[in-house]
Curated annotation (Swiss-Prot):
Its cofactor is Mg(2+). It catalyses: N-(5-phospho-beta-D-ribosyl)anthranilate + diphosphate = 5-phospho-alpha-D-ribose 1-diphosphate + anthranilate. It comes from Neisseria meningitidis serogroup C (strain 053442). The gene is trpD. Binds 2 magnesium ions per monomer. This is Anthranilate phosphoribosyltransferase. Belongs to the anthranilate phosphoribosyltransferase family. Pathway: Amino-acid biosynthesis; L-tryptophan biosynthesis; L-tryptophan from chorismate: step 2/5.
Amino acid sequence: MITPQQAIERLISNNELFYDEMTDLMRQMMSGKVPPEQIAAILTGLRIKVETVSEITAAAAVMREFATKVPLENAEGLVDIVGTGGDGAKTFNISTTSMFVAAAAGAKVAKHGGRSVSSSSGAADVVEQMGANLNLTPEQVAQSIRQTGIGFMFAPNHHSAMRHVAPVRRSLGFRSIFNILGPLTNPAGAPNQLLGVFHTDLCGILSRVLQQLGSKHVLVVCGEGGLDEITLTGKTRVAELKDGKISEYDIRPEDFGIETRRNLDEIKVANTQESLLKMNEVLEGREGAARDIVLLNTAAALYAGNVAASLSDGISAAREAIDSGRAKSKKEEFVGFQPQQRCHFLGKMELG
């Protein structure tokens, strides 16, 4: 067993922690056995040294171990559409909009998200703004997935052990390992994923982490300029995990007949209300940059979820889901499912 002090000494000497050591240390932190000042030192040491694939994998495995899981008989076909955040782009909720389009095209989406930390509007903020209930029990989330094809898991409801580290990570003022752990710890166990990251280096790193964690089909993407989505402004780096193997490549909007934009100004928003307005415009079929970026990201989600055979097929399916009105109806179905009785979970707690 490694003590927090031993871990700190290893990290400040620029030495990595072995998998078993990181597992043990993470369990101590998630159990409330490590004082805040030592948590701060550990997170700082990991950031300065740079977290390894092994360290991230161990930490994610422990977070999954401590999570309150969604009880599903079969999670095999589930796909998560999620981003790390931290890109500072202030775009509308692209992945949340894509959730409705993907579900309308036949995907089973188990989306894991929280409130805004660095963006104009977090996934949970916009889901709440549209009138949905964030505080579903795990059983109700499972029922939502079965009935509507969508389940939204508000992160604090499923990661109560984060209360031991959340105040420290918020106070640090810089990214820590926890910024990338959230997207790796889907409580429904979705084996397929479209994961947006804020730096191209993370594409290869997190695809290897998810490979070790047993994921099946994953696209880890980083748009030009550090956007944690597939972008419209140029190339997007993709690390794809499929059939146990990882391949890396670049894609561009014009590869799929979509116009490359000079900037993302058309899809930037100032708050949750503006984000929901932009989402509704897309779901109602309005042409423009917002629709195009949703088409690209939905296509990737459909491909990752094995609903589409390729990204090009995914574009066609996404376009048809919007133009037929099914994507708009899917959103209404999702919001309408939510039970009126609120459950007293940890709804006010933030993961970060």
